[in-house]
Amino acid sequence: MENFISDLASFIWTWNVPVLVGSGIFFLIYSKLTPFKYLKHAFELILGKHSKEGDIGEVTHFQALTTALSGTIGLGNIAGVAIAIQLAGPGAIFWMWLTAVVGIATKFFTCTLSVMYRDVGEDGTVRGGPMYVIKNALPNSMMPLAYFFAAAGLIGALPGFQSNQLVQIIGDLPIFQFDNFNLIAGVILAGVTGVIILGGLIRIAKVSEWLVPLMSLLYFGSVLIALMLNYDSIIPAFQIIIADAFTGSAVAGGSVIAVIIMGVRRGAHSNEAGIGTETLVHGSAKTSDPVKQGLVAMLCPIFDTLIMCTSTALLIIISGVWLISDSTGVTLTAEAFSALLGPLGYAVLFICVVSFGASTIFTYSFYGSACSQFLFGEKGVKFYQWVIILFVIVFAVIPIEAAINIIDISFALMAIPTLISTVWLAPKVIFKAREYFSALEEST
């Protein structure tokens, strides 16, 4: 079964890579690089400079960004990068950069649409995401795509990677190396998860609002210190990444295609551009204009892939552990931290992994709950939340390869309705963007 899941993931991502990257390139060209022209304005938005009293929505721009970042900045940046380097070599990082660059435009389009076509319930509750975009903007004949996304999202939002890697780094400590530790740790983690996720989006957003920025600064600061102490190795590390991206020398058989596929797979898991998950929370943002949230959302690939993933990759490459270690995932990153910063480095990574892993589980629970609500109504949400709690335990005890392949398959399937609807409605986004930026220029 494990081999079948692995083969299926490889097959699906072979064709999903050109679809994701090609769509991003289309959005870049079609928008005439508009997202990049307004990066400064996007940063002003997350600082609340252009917010208005009475905006419709559940959470602020900053909360929406940090909640979405808690799903993207996390173990994908720490363990996902290690897995990419381990399986495909440093060259995979170059292709992760590519997904981030085109992903900036993709996120602008998908998240703008999520606000444009979101649902506002009678009680004022706001719901967004690809399924509502399809429901409210496309012909009724396209509704199967909405159900397809939500069904795939039920699996894609399960905390497979996070639960597995969180338990792995804790289990690496000598004190916890005993029989059935993974099961015991999974049960404890499931209990903590239940306390948070049963509180809904508002509680998740409040936790993410302070936890994600704090842990991001701690992690990035630690990596920055390690890089400064080894500054003479930074340029050679970049040279290794770029050279390996076009040779595939670190992959068995020297396949460049394998390097590209792995880089895009891990890039998609890192920044989620084009997958549709991030639109679920950005669609709930308090905003008077959809374009504002599209601008805020497009910052995610910059933070999580271009900054965080690159930092982790440089750390692992400079440490040299990727050449000599058989460790996998978060353990390989931990060895790199220990090699460059000693026991203190490991301690910092441990704190960050626990925090990031937990916050990502909380965010993914909201993603899955939103899909469940669309398919089954409010009664389905509570049931699905208990399913998440159960699967925290399940994924804690299965091999990392199985956990990550299951999520990768689901992500690839979720991208299909997301990108179809976004390409279809791209002219609507451009029309809204022109209105917004014209008004912005007149007011300045």
Where are the regions that the model predicts?
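N-terminal alpha-helical transmembrane segments of multi-pass membrane transport
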Residues: 1-75, 86-92, 103, 393, ...
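Transmembrane helix-loop junctions in multi-pass membrane proteins
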Residues: 16, 30-35, 76-81, 157-169, ...
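Transmembrane alpha-helical segments of multi-pass small-molecule transport proteins
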Residues: 17-22, 97, 146-151, 174-201, ...
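Membrane-interface loop-to-helix entry segments
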Residues: 19-23, 27-43, 167-170, 181-229, ...
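Alpha-helical membrane segments and immediately flanking helix-loop junctions
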Residues: 53-87, 113-131, 135-137, 148-151, ...
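Hydrophobic transmembrane alpha-helices that form the core helical bundles
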Residues: 87, 96-100, 104-119, 124-176, ...
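Selective recognition of specific alpha-helical transmembrane segments in multi-pass small-molecule
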Residues: 102-110, 187-201, 212-232, 265-266, ...
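Extracellular/periplasmic helix-exit of transmembrane alpha-helices
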Residues: 110-118, 122, 223-240, 254, ...
